[in-house]
Amino acid sequence: MQHTQSEKLHEEALQHIVGGVNSPSRSYKAVGGGSPVAMERGSGAYFWDVDGNKYIDYLAAYGPIITGHAHPHITKAIQTAAENGVLYGTPTKHEVTFAKMLKEAIPALDKVRFVNSGTEAVMTTIRVARAYTGRTKIIKFAGCYHGHSDLVLVAAGSGPSTLGTPDSAGVPKSIANEVITVPFNDIDSYKEALDKWGNDIAAVLVEPIVGNFGIVEPKSGFLEQVNELTHNAGALVIYDEVITAFRFMYGGAQDLLGVKPDLTALGKIIGGGLPIGAYGGRKEIMEQVAPLGPAYQAGTMAGNPASILSGIACLEVLKEKGTYEKLDRLGAMLEEGILAHAETHGIDITVNRLKGALTVYFTNEKVENYEQAENTDGDMFAAFFKLMLERGINLAPSKYEAWFITTAHTEEDIKDTLKAVDDSFKQLKQRM
């Protein structure tokens, strides 16, 4: 494939946009560098770049595009919003409709509030939890990304009983001192953290199914134990379902797993491709939020008609019969094919899959926590990523990210993808 126009565009972008990209995950730094491919058009499961090359897309904008690009029902909803005004600054009937849809889908939401992103949603759940409990510290799990607000850009300390350290320049040490980071799926470390800091903990922030160092499921009983221990300490459980909500079933991962949090943060899929976030939870906790309570949160763009109508349309599509069965079927087909080709060519991989999302790790070890994900072979992934890109398969440019199947993908797309996997593994083996 030729990428001449992408390369020229990236050179121009570097003159005007920091790093040439508007989110660092879009750069190719994690896969050895180079000019990221610039896309011009998306339709269904496919992308076309500025050089005219066609790709089968498994990035899905890092998850939100679960119905494929430019789904006609969602497109029509956005067009309707554009024709009637995209921003009012007033209440609308559509935001009530959408709030009811979310509550019906996720029973833990007694009350909801719309915001503009997953970052905002998580940031506000932490504020609300602090207001409700009168405490300040939070616990999070290593490797789990919860947006780019200061409080969650914190790396682990030297152990579960030590405070975190800033994971980004510009995050004050004083803020990192409010965060304890422990390994995911390690209940003993979680107990140790609570033994040390329990009386100061406002909430634990949990991805019930991890999506940010690949797809990693909780061990049996882990979430239940986290709930029990947290509540015994007088703290709240916050689920970050920005990636997981409506990804694995119609509703949240909490409903799939049968574990209920106190507060939930939502984003990505619920906007149908437009910017949105939402948070919600138990009535008595949510009543801490202004104008009812002292925890302030506001937003000019929050609940705007364009995002709300797009979100309603997206959920209407996802509610159709057979949606999640199809995603699971195609996911299984893709997983089985990848593993078979890896065995044929003698490539060490493991695949973590849940229904229509999976991660391919270049390792022979089952990945259950961030340390294991970190130890997978990044050089092998980088080579694989570039080989797949040349064969018309668009993946996220990071070994930590998931492949997302959409409702627009077909069995033929999976077969074509597996041909590319077979050829790429063959090339990798020859280089070893």
Swiss-Prot record:
One of its GO terms (cellular component) is cytoplasm. Disulfide bonds: none annotated. It comes from the Bacteria. It catalyses: (S)-4-amino-5-oxopentanoate = 5-aminolevulinate. Its EC number is 5.4.3.8. It is an enzyme of class 5 (isomerase). GO terms for molecular function: glutamate-1-semialdehyde 2,1-aminomutase activity; pyridoxal phosphate binding; transaminase activity. InterPro entries: 4pyrrol_synth_GluAld_NH2Trfase, Aminotrans_3, Aminotrans_3_PPA_site, PyrdxlP-dep_Trfase, PyrdxlP-dep_Trfase_major, PyrdxlP-dep_Trfase_small. It is found in: Cytoplasm. Its cofactor is pyridoxal 5'-phosphate. PANTHER family: GLUTAMATE-1-SEMIALDEHYDE 2,1-AMINOMUTASE (PTHR43713), GLUTAMATE-1-SEMIALDEHYDE 2,1-AMINOMUTASE 2 (PTHR43713:SF1). Belongs to the class-III pyridoxal-phosphate-dependent aminotransferase family. HemL subfamily. This is Glutamate-1-semialdehyde 2,1-aminomutase 1. It comes from Bacillus licheniformis (strain ATCC 14580 / DSM 13 / JCM 2505 / CCUG 7422 / NBRC 12200 / NCIMB 9375 / NCTC 10341 / NRRL NRS-1264 / Gibson 46).
